[in-house]
Amino acid sequence: MMLLKRCNRRALVALAAVLLLAACGGARELPDLSDVGDGVATETLWTASTGSGSASSAYALVPAVEGGRVYAADSNGRVTAWDAESGERLWRVDTGRELAAGPGAGGGLVLVGARDGRLLALDAENGEERWVSGLSSEILAVPQIARNIVVARSGDGRVYGLDGLTGRRLWIHDRSVPVLTLRGSSSPVVVGNRVVVGQDNGRLVTLNLQDGEVIWEAPVSIPRGRSDLERMVDLHADPLVFRGVAYAQAYQGELAAVGMGDGRERWSRDIPGHTGMAADSRQLYVVDDQSRLWALDRNNGATVWRQDRLQGLRLTAPVVIGGHLVLADEEGYLNWIAPDNGDLVGRDRHGRQPIQRPPVPDGDVLYLLSADGRLAALRLVED
């Protein structure tokens, strides 16, 4: 169920919208996929528990893999590090806060965001607190770090650049947000010296990492309709930057490809969604608002194929690994798709809890986090 947030006006309409969406979600009919076999073989290397898991589907709690370690957090404030190969637990700390986003990892730091707007930086070696910085509202996007600058986004749409050593604020990008938006935020993407951000107003912006100045801003989708609900065009899915092109998808709007050099639109398609994207050398893969998976030509946006058999399931963003395409779903399955033709070649279940965030690939290993906090490391078994 998609959650909404309302700014500066009565919450009654937002509540009604949530109830309406919940009612629609309750009436969903799950597809019959009993004829689909196991597909791509995997072996479980290890499993572990992060603690309590995620308290909300709006939270961006997702594993981070960095320097031979896996980091994960739970809603109750625990952050844990494991050895990526063996699954040995290296450390665990209790931050004492309700965590809603992260971890982001890099530069010797593990970064997590809290419901109260606090951004916490922990030492990657031992979990000790390095610094805490207060942002303007809850943090629902995974913090990033590059060139010793931490980039974080708060729920009110502000983007911050912070000193990685001290947490001191270096810059802030502030844009007004629409009256009604989806709860949750797309995470910023750092590419070189640029920060790419999908905004709640349907625009994609690229900032200078050093000072937060706008390099370019491009409209992905324009609000339409009379009501606040109809006019929602959040870029809720994380932007994807691949080979010099930024891809962004709007809720109730368009999917667009924008050149990173000049911010000019390359192509646009009417494929609304809020989940996320993946790409390989030929194709862009994207899930629409009906849980249909599309493969598009990256150069012109033309449809290569569309897979409709997963309609009715709540899917994660697709992930490309080892020549395969995989998506997790709310029933605890991994769904394996053939990239060439879109065939559903297999499904395998990893527990009965929803998988709300995409698996994290690292080489030939997938790290999978269920809503109850079960973390699994799976290795592809090639024939």
Swiss-Prot record:
Keywords: Cell outer membrane, Lipoprotein, Membrane, Palmitate, Signal. Pfam families: PQQ_2. Its main location: membrane. It is a lipid-anchor. GO terms for cellular component: cell outer membrane. SMART domains: PQQ (SM00564). A lipid is attached at residue 24 (S-diacylglycerol cysteine). A lipid is attached at residue 24 (N-palmitoyl cysteine). Residues 1-23 form the signal peptide. It is found in: Cell outer membrane. GO terms for biological process: Gram-negative-bacterium-type cell outer membrane assembly; protein insertion into membrane. Belongs to the BamB family. Part of the Bam complex. Part of the outer membrane protein assembly complex, which is involved in assembly and insertion of beta-barrel proteins into the outer membrane. This is Outer membrane protein assembly factor BamB. The lineage of its organism: Bacteria, Pseudomonadati, Pseudomonadota, Gammaproteobacteria, Chromatiales. The gene is bamB.
